């Protein structure tokens, strides 16, 4: 079984080997090479088939099979690295811990020597990064990492479908805040997978799903099934299920149904060096989540998201009856003109308890509203009408089931 390690735990020998192997893979112009595999995600579009008159990107977003599609995609690239001599699995970048710069394994200022920095895609452009300030400085000014807090809300969910929505939208912000306004980078659905950082990011995304699965086992709850997108779970993922001319990997082609990809250890042949989160074991993490649920009443803003044909950064303010507005939160949408149509069937939720307290508002008041600002990847403003107005839900602490007052 292949071991996936934290990028910060790689030895110098492992780093040099991975860089050498990645360089070879990027120079491989066959169907086994980096660019051929990267095209599975976005451009050039391969779905429903390479021969179709009208094609879309094959990547799955806004659907219950998002985790499975990206699990098998990351495995596809990992297997290609192994084919060129890699001895460790796809390393992961644990972005749930606070950071002020990208890991030394994936810098963005060493463009000539490190093949994990950038490559040339099929349109003869280099991938580029435009890290946004929010990536390194918590936009909400919280005590912990922005990403850590959002991940806790995802891990708190006890139903796969609720978890998936939270989990997916969190991952979008890493894409957007690294790629920024660059066309050929992490913030565009079409070109994101041409940046090698994509796979380092998604190795961690997959690890977080594995942590949730272990939490579910600890809770005695289902960890390998979905009660939403039931038909999707039976449909082979594309383009992995296409012919060997598109996908020469016999393993991913044979195991391309989402329902077969819940058990990554058995089917994908890799493990993680640790399934802890910020040093917490599964049992400690569950205890922490239960404490979070019991400590105080919470207020959540909910958004029913759908594809808008573009990647976008969304910020929203909470405004009172006098139009006094305070920043309430931010999230991102990952998309583009080649995306499959999608819409979530449930709300993405963000904890807005803090801003309700600051503004001395109650969630059962009627005289408040959210104002959204939606900025497209290119930096242009989009109409807030593209997204449905946010709703509010109140979740009482488990110890005291009192009236919804968060003052």
UniProtKB/Swiss-Prot annotation:
UniProt: Cu cation B binding residues: 171, 175, 202
Please give the name of this protein. Hemocyanin type 2 unit a
Mind telling me where the 2'-(S-cysteinyl)-histidine (Cys-His) cross-link is?
A: 59-61
List localization entries: Secreted, Extracellular space
UniProt subunit comment: Decamers of large identical subunits, each containing 8 globular oxygen-binding functional units.
Give the cofactor note text: Binds 2 copper ions per heterodimer.
Task of the protein: Hemocyanins are copper-containing oxygen carriers occurring freely dissolved in the hemolymph of many mollusks and arthropods.
What organism is recorded for this protein? Answer: Rapana venosa (Veined rapa whelk)
Got a GO cellular component term for this one? extracellular region
Lineage, opening ranks: Eukaryota, Metazoa, Spiralia, Lophotrochozoa, Mollusca
Which keywords are on file for this protein?
A: Copper, Disulfide bond, Glycoprotein, Metal-binding, Oxygen transport, Secreted, Thioether bond, Transport
Please name the GO terms that the record assigns under molecular function.
Answer: metal ion binding; oxidoreductase activity; oxygen carrier activity
Disulphide-bridged cysteine pairs: 47-58, 161-228, 319-325
Query: Does this entry carry the keyword Glycoprotein?
Result: yes
Q: Which InterPro entries match?
A: Di-copper_centre_dom_sf, Haemocyanin_beta-sandwich, Haemocyanin_C_sf, Tyrosinase/Hemocyanin, Tyrosinase_Cu-bd
Q: Which cofactor does it need?
A: Cu(2+)
Q: Which family does it belong to?
A: Belongs to the tyrosinase family. Hemocyanin subfamily.
């Amino acid at each position: 079984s292949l071991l996936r390690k934290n990028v910060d735990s790689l030895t110098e020998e492992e780093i040099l080997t991975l860089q050498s192997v990645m360089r070879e893979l990027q120079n491989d112009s066959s169907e086994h090479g980096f660019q051929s595999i990267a095209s599975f995600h976005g451009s050039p579009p391969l779905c429903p088939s390479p021969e179709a008159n009208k094609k879309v990107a094959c990547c799955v977003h806004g659907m219950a099979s998002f985790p499975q599609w990206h699990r098998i995609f990351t495995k596809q690239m990992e297997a290609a690295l192994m084919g060129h001599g890699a001895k460790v699995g796809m390393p992961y970048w644990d972005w749930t811990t606070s950071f002020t710069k990208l890991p030394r394994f994936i810098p963005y200022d060493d463009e000539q020597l490190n093949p994990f920095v950038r490559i040339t895609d099929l349109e003869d452009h280099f991938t580029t990064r435009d890290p946004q300030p929010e990536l390194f400085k918590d936009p909400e000014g919280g005590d912990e990492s922005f990403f850590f807090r959002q991940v806790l809300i995802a891990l708190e969910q006890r139903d796969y479908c609720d978890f998936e929505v939270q989990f997916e939208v969190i991952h979008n912000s890493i894409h957007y805040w690294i790629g920024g306004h660059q066309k050929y980078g992490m913030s565009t659905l079409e070109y994101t997978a041409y940046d090698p950082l994509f796979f380092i990011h998604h190795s961690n995304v997959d690890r977080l799903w594995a942590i949730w699965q272990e939490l579910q086992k600890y809770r005695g709850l289902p960890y390998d099934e979905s009660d939403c997108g039931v038909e999707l779970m039976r449909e082979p993922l594309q383009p992995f299920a296409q012919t060997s001319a598109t996908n020469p990997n016999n393993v991913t082609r044979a195991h391309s149904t989402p329902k077969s990809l819940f058990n990554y250890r058995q089917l994908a042949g890799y493990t993680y060096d640790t399934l802890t989160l910020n040093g917490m074991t599964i049992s400690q993490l569950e205890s922490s989540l239960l404490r979070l649920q019991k400590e105080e009443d919470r207020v959540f803003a909910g958004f029913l998201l759908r594809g808008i044909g573009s990647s976008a950064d969304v910020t929203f303010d909470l405004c009172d009856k006098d139009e006094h507005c305070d920043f309430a939160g931010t999230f991102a949408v990952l998309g583009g003109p080649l995306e499959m149509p999608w819409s979530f069937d449930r709300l993405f939720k963000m904890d807005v308890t803090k801003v309700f307290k600051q503004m001395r508002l109650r969630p059962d008041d009627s005289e408040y509203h959210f104002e959204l600002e939606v900025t497209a990847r290119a930096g242009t403003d989009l109409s807030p009408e593209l997204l449905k107005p946010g709703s509010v839900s109140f979740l009482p602490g488990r110890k005291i089931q009192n009236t919804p007052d968060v003052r």
